């Protein structure tokens, strides 16, 4: 058993609350246990300069953590004047993951920006952000459809993400902070609804992992992601 009495291959309690804030075209509070991320999707009826005149849209993401989302307060990155490498890496990952679920041609010359703000962190903030942001993105695209700004639904399929790791030679799904801090290996896995991989980020901390262990982690991750996609579908009323 684990710290919170979960089974090795069990997700934390996952909640996806839509329409969490008033103004954004898509707004989701996603909770993976004690990790809570606010994901808001905003529409801009233009595209970045490098896409002008190409008849396609763009999806991008920003990520940040509130100063006291962790055990001790951290300065706001805006106050420091620059983003950390970690923040830049995570927001690029979120953007790549979300673009995989959209036909950018069908999006027209519109940009959807997803802001992922961590309000409480207990491990898995990037995977929770991707899972919640996917729902917020769908809500924003539905606004474009309802307002007849686009003619066809750009959605290709859902996307979700989860962490897996090896602790004391056991594969664990959906790591909390303490598990993540002490595991031998951890992976972040992003997959499509169709079971295709978008990203696999893996690092051995204490000792290298074998191909057999890698396969075992991916199997557990795939199981968890399929469960998350069902939760996304329930939240969307599908």
UniProtKB/Swiss-Prot annotation:
Which is one GO molecular function term here? Answer: tRNA nucleotidyltransferase activity
Per the record, what are the reactions this protein catalyses? tRNA(n+1) + phosphate = tRNA(n) + a ribonucleoside 5'-diphosphate
In terms of SUPFAM superfamilies, this protein maps to: Ribonuclease PH domain 2-like, Ribosomal protein S5 domain 2-like
Q: What is its EC number?
A: 2.7.7.56
Q: Which domain of life is it from?
A: Bacteria
What InterPro entries does UniProt report for this protein, alphabetically? ExoRNase_PH_dom1 (IPR001247), ExoRNase_PH_dom2 (IPR015847), ExoRNase_PH_dom2_sf (IPR036345), PNPase/RNase_PH_dom_sf (IPR027408), Ribosomal_Su5_D2-typ_SF (IPR020568), RNase_PH (IPR050080), RNase_PH_bac-type (IPR002381), RNase_PH_CS (IPR018336)
Give binding positions for phosphate. 86, 124-126
PROSITE patterns for the chain: RIBONUCLEASE_PH
Q: Which GO terms describe its biological process?
A: rRNA catabolic process; rRNA processing; tRNA processing
Annotated Gene3D superfamilies: GHMP Kinase, N-terminal domain (3.30.230.70)
Alphabetical UniProt keywords? Nucleotidyltransferase, RNA-binding, rRNA processing, Transferase, tRNA processing, tRNA-binding
Q: Which PANTHER family match?
A: EXOSOME COMPLEX COMPONENT (PTHR11953), EXOSOME COMPLEX COMPONENT RRP41 (PTHR11953:SF0)
**Of which family is this protein a member?**
Belongs to the RNase PH family.
Subunit relationships: Homohexameric ring arranged as a trimer of dimers.
The protein's role, per its UniProt record: Phosphorolytic 3'-5' exoribonuclease that plays an important role in tRNA 3'-end maturation. Removes nucleotide residues following the 3'-CCA terminus of tRNAs; can also add nucleotides to the ends of RNA molecules by using nucleoside diphosphates as substrates, but this may not be physiologically important. Probably plays a role in initiation of 16S rRNA degradation (leading to ribosome degradation) during starvation.
Protein name, UniProt field:
Ribonuclease PH
Q: What is the lineage of its organism?
A: Bacteria, Pseudomonadati, Pseudomonadota, Gammaproteobacteria, Moraxellales
């Amino acid at each position: 058993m684990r710290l919170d009495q979960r089974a090795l291959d069990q997700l934390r309690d996952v909640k996806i609350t839509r329409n969490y804030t008033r103004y954004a075209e898509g707004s989701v509070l996603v909770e993976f246990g004690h990790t809570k991320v606010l994901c808001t999707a905003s529409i801009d009826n233009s595209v970045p300069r490098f896409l002008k005149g190409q008849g396609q849209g763009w999806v991008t993401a920003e990520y940040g953590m509130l100063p006291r989302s962790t055990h001790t307060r951290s300065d706001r990155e805006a106050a420091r004047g620059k983003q950390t490498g970690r923040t830049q890496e995570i927001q690029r990952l979120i953007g790549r993951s979300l673009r995989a679920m959209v036909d950018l041609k069908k999006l027209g010359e519109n940009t959807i920006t997803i802001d992922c703000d961590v309000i409480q962190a207990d491990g898995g903030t990037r995977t929770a952000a991707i899972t919640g942001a996917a729902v917020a993105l769908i809500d924003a695209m539905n606004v474009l459809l309802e307002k007849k700004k686009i003619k066809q639904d750009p959605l290709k399929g859902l996307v979700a993400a989860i962490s897996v790791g090896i602790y004391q030679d056991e594969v664990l799904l959906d790591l909390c902070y303490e598990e993540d801090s002490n595991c031998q290996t951890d992976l972040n896995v992003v997959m499509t609804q169709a079971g295709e991989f978008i990203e696999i980020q893996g690092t051995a901390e204490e000792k290298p992992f074998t191909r057999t262990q890698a396969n075992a982690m991916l199997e557990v991750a795939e199981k968890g992601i399929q469960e998350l996609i069902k939760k996304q579908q329930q939240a969307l009323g599908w």
